Structures are given as C-alpha cells and as structure tokens.
Amino acid sequence: NLQDHTIRFIVDDCIKFVKREQRRGRKYDGIVMDPPSYGRGPNGELWKLEEELFPLIQECMKILSDDALFFIVNCYTTGFSCSTLNEALSRSIQKEKGGHIECGENLLPVTTNDSVLPCGIFGRWTND
C-alpha cells in the first residue's frame, strides 16, 4: 500500500545527506540503506563499514519520524556478521523506539542444483 506515499531514492554521501536532512528538519517514515564496505571521499575521507555503521544508524535515527515504519540495512561486507548488525540495531533503534528486529543472510539460489550461495546479510527494524 505504498502507491499513495512519496518514495525517494537517494544516491549520495550518506553521512552528508543525513546531516543535511537533519538541518532541514526533514523526517522519514522508513529508511533503506545499502552502505559500502569501504570507500574514500573526494578529500581522502575513509569509510569502513565496521567502524562507521553504528554512528550512521544513530544519525539516521534523528531523521526517522515518530511514526516510522521500518529501517532496513543491507550489507555485503565479508566478515560482518548478523549478530553484529543485530546488536547495532538493538542498541540504537530498538532501544529508543521498541519494535522488532530481524537479521539474516542474503542468499542466491543456484539454478543448476538445489543449493544457495550466501552473498551478504540484512537487518530490518519494524515498528509493530
């Protein structure tokens, strides 16, 4: 039932975007993020998911509306576990807003046999 809702897809430096939205006083009912494992900004800024994800989630919480419905994180970082993502979401969003957290593996089915290939993890907070 999202046909009557405004949905924006943003490709931008995530921290700069979130801080800009904070200054503008904007609020969102849901956030879907797919942060990179590693990256460098134009001025040599270093981004490492394992160091920056928790602060990013905390900043995003400031732009979640009081009636937020969901917050989804997709990760492809090798060695970043479901339990780590679950802990980050629990200590931030769930601690402040309650709700439910689900974390798991992203799996790709292999069409030539009856198996799957793991290709990352996801975390989802919902306000239920």
Locate predicted features.
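Conserved protein kinase catalytic core
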Residues: 19, 40, 80
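A short glycine-rich, Lys/Arg-flanked "PGG" loop and its adjoining helix->strand segment in the class I
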Residues: 50-66
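C-terminal catalytic and target-recognition region of SAM-dependent MTase-like enzymes
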Residues: 68-128
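Active-site-proximal loop/turn and secondary-structure-junction residues that shape catalytic pockets
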Residues: 13-15, 37, 77
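Glycine/threonine-rich flexible loop motifs
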Residues: 41-49
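S-adenosyl-L-methionine
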Residues: 1-32
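Glycine-rich, phosphate-binding/catalytic loops in enzymes
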Residues: 48-51, 89-90
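Conserved proline-anchored active-site loop of SAM-dependent methyltransferases
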Residues: 28-42
